[in-house]
């Protein structure tokens, strides 16, 4: 019940809440990975909360989608690529920084530091479903990724991205912004 006082109070609703909830599902995106803190199938919500990890030396290639995303960096250092009036530019990010990516804005990420780049990602359930469909579930007994795994992932990624209406930069477009695929 909400107290009837002048002090600050927050109504969390009548449904039970959890502190630090997670679905336990983590998927590998052939380098970067995401952990689902909320399920994209959850009803009654218009967002999906993820914890994203980009290992040292790894990039997320140039892409865009109609879904908005907000990133809150929780540890590590990295860079985000944005398209400005003068073309593409990399911006430096560190723990505590927030990045808003509007729908259909071309963007990319890279970790140029020696530790994982970790962020909370607030996005749409649709993008969460995309990650579920394209990612490889992470299990504690997973074997290292092989070149065949990467080739299979790239083919599946392109197919699923097309189904969702997402755009991915070509190898040439990525090379032009400093990402070598």
What function would you assign to each model-found segment?
Residues 1-47, 147-181:
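A short, N-terminal "cap"/entry segment at the start of jelly-roll beta-barrel domains
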Residues 33-37, 48-64:
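Conserved short histidine dyad/triad with adjacent acidic residue
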Residues 38-39, 59-65, 82, 90-91, ...:
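Short histidine-centered beta-strand/loop micro-motifs
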Residues 42-43, 70-72, 84-103:
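Short acidic-glycine-tyrosine-enriched beta hairpin
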Residues 56, 66-79, 83-84:
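Glycine- and acidic-residue-biased ligand/ion/polar-headgroup-sensing regions
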Residues 79, 103-129:
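Ligand-binding loop in jelly-roll beta-barrel domains
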Residues 129-149:
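A hydrophobic, small-residue-rich beta->alpha segment in the mid-to-C-terminal subdomain
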């Amino acid at each position: 019940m909400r107290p009837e006082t002048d002090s600050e109070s927050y109504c969390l609703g009548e449904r039970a809440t959890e502190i630090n909830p997670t679905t336990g599902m983590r998927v590998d995106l052939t380098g970067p990975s995401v952990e689902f803190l909320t399920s994209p199938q959850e009803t009654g919500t218009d967002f999906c909360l993820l914890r994203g990890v980009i290992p040292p030396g790894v990039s997320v290639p140039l892409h865009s989608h109609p879904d908005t995303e907000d990133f809150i960096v929780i540890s590590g250092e990295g860079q985000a690529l944005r398209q400005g009036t003068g073309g593409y530019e990399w911006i430096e990010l560190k723990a505590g920084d927030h990045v808003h990516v509007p729908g259909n804005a071309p963007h990319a990420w890279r970790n140029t530091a020696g530790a994982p780049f970790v962020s909370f990602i607030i996005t749409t359930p649709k993008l969460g479903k995309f990650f579920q469909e394209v990612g490889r579930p992470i299990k504690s007994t997973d074997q290292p990724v092989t070149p065949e795994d990467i080739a299979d992932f790239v083919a599946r990624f392109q197919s699923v991205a097309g189904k969702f209406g997402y755009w991915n930069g070509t190898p040439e477009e990525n090379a032009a912004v400093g990402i070598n695929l």
